[in-house]
Amino acid sequence: MFLQVEMYLSFKKKYSMKTNFNFNSVLQIWNDYKVLFVFSDDNRVSCRLSFYNDTPQDAIISDLYVHESIRKQGGATAILNWCFEYAKDRGCNSVSLRSDNDDWVREWYKRLDFKVISSQVWLTKNI
């Protein structure tokens, strides 16, 4: 069971040297965690920011998406910076995420001061 609380946070702030993005959010609250869906006005940049009750000092970013027509224009950096600020304002001292094993993506996250703390291997079995 969850209690949905809609909260639209909208503001313009220059997070990127190339462009301004206006972000909105919707917050959903369950018993043991909260999820903030963050998206640009035109829905071409979006992600989820989760907060779990058992690790309140850490926020988790997932499902980062930037439409191909605006990639490499600062949208991903802008929405991540929005998430960093939002999480910090709520008492978090770290933000975590999982990334594909792609050198370019991993290096991009490192430029944003993310540190690799583990690696995973996905296994499959035909049945």
Q: Where are the model-predicted features located?
A:
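Conserved acetyl-CoA-binding loop-helix of GNAT-fold acetyltransferases
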Residues: 66, 72-85, 111
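Conserved GNAT acetyl-CoA-binding A-motif
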Residues: 87-100
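Alpha-helical interaction/dimerization surfaces of two-component signaling modules
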Residues: 11-14, 86, 108, 112
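A conserved beta-strand-loop-helix scaffold within acyl/acetyltransferase catalytic domains
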Residues: 28-34, 41-42, 46-58, 64-65
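Conserved active-site alpha-helix within GNAT-family acetyltransferase domains
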Residues: 77, 101-119
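Short hydrophobic/aromatic beta-strand or adjacent loop that forms the aromatic wall/cage
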Residues: 33-35, 117-122
